[in-house]
Amino acid sequence: MHFSIPETESRSGDSGGSTYVAYNIHVNGVLHCRVRYSQLLGLHEQLRKEYGANVLPAFPPKKLFSLTPAEVEQRREQLEKYMQAVRQDPLLGSSETFNSFLRRAQQETQQVPTEEVSLEVLLSDGQKVLVNVLTSDQTEDVLEAVAAKLDLPDDLIGYFSLFLVREKEDGAFSFVRKLQEFELPYVSVTSLRSQEYKIVLRKSYWDSAYDDDVMENRVGLNLLYAQTVSDIEHGWILVTKEQHRQLKSLQEKVSKKEFLRLAQTLRHYGYLRFDACVADFPEKDCPVVVSAGNSELSLQLRLPGQQLREGSFRVTRMRCWRVTSSVPLPSGGTSTPSRGRGEVRLELAFEYLMSKDRLQWVTITSPQAIMMSICLQSMVDELMVKKSGGSIRKMLRRRVGGNLRRSDSQQAVKSPPLLESPDASRESMVKLSSKLSAVSLRGIGSPSTDASASAVHGNFAFEGIGDEDL
């Protein structure tokens, strides 16, 4: 998650008397909450009590007198760095103190009272699931409510997550972000004030070996099946005509497990696909389509001659990556403390081991750069869990004073319709992709992005290349 405080506001108190400075905290470029300095100071003091002063980053000190515009700007920058440092710390960023502070602030900022509401959550194929939740329910609460509605066992809930998406005209989803523990899903989706934004349930792991755990259960099997059919229909999974025929035959026989077994062998099975964007690979300003999955980032690009090619970047060969944000300066080329900002430009850059002893930066410019970074981190986390012999099965916390809330009524996951015939353009694209070798990974210069613009994510799953790989 990318935390920023891009602007401040001068606001009046509840009584309409004295004014105060409000700091607008954004997550992934969208307003999350509006807080005062005193509220952030209270958070800092609470974290210091729980974890000690040595663990915490520096916090801007109190001032006896009113701040000048320049001092407000300086404090904004210091608070932004503080919030980013706390969030990136594994201990502090996952603490209930930090997350509950952000949830309360989000609810107060949007002025949403705590009450029971009906929240619509979509499955990957568009099926609607209505759950009764509180407006103050956090992400895990809503996920549990959806699981209860579908009768998904508790020990399989950890295999799924809720995602905030924007529904496009063709029915496909453009992923905004995975909903986090510091936000309230109802408030997050309604505060955007657009019917395009939805909450979607989707599997949250990358390694298809975990499918076996989910497929043991009827509901889990149906969820995977519905997601896979949807991904094929939208062209996320690459399918030839013959493979499409085999899949449709298995559908007609209602052989869901066999359908999934075949789908697992297909290119881009289980991948998340992003909107078209721009990369500096294999040349500057190259239009690409990025997909994430199977411990890699895939870049599909069309070269001169209309040939579609694919470059695959393994996460184990990424030494580190960073997300940078920049805002064009207003006309005149100077920044002012007024905090008036234009559209944010986001870039994901990763340092890749192209060959033995040769690292090279690759940069992707996309509004979804932060989501791509989150995918990289979750793939690394999953690799580390598997390497240590751990499991992603999630034993849910029990609430104080009782068991998990269960739904009064349950809803079955409907089987999606049979696959439609693939269009000709998609078929030709698959043929080219399967026959041509990967694009050259040589001759690309390092980007001019300023590394100080954001934190660099080190990769604990980074591996060297042996002679046998060359």
From Swiss-Prot:
A single GO BP? endocytic recycling
Quick one: where's region FERM-like? 115-432
Q: Where is this region: PTB-like F3 module?
A: 270-432
Q: How does it assemble?
A: Monomer. Interacts with APP (via cytoplasmic YXNPXY motif). Interacts with KIF1B. Interacts with the C-termini of P-selectin, PTC, LDLR, VLDLR, LRP1 and LRP8. Interacts with KRIT1 (via N-terminus). Interacts with HRAS. Interacts with ITGB1 and ITGB5 (via NPxY motif). Interacts with CCDC22 and CCDC93; the interaction associates SNX17 with the CCC complex. Interacts (via C-terminus) with VPS26C and VPS35L; the interactions are direct and associate SNX17 with the retriever complex.
Domain note: The PX domain mediates specific binding to phosphatidylinositol 3-phosphate (PtdIns(P3)). Required for association with endosomes. The PTB-like F3 module within the FERM-like domain mediates cargo recognition via their NPxY sequences, while the F1 module (Ras-associating) is responsible for interaction with membrane-bound HRAS.
Q: What is its main location?
A: cytoplasm
Give the CDD domains listed for this entry.
FERM-like_C_SNX17, FERM_F1_SNX17, PX_SNX17_31
Name this protein carries in UniProt: Sorting nexin-17
- Its source organism is Rattus norvegicus (Rat)
Signal sequence extent = none
Please list the disulfide bridges.
none
Fetch the SMART domains from UniProt: PX (SM00312)
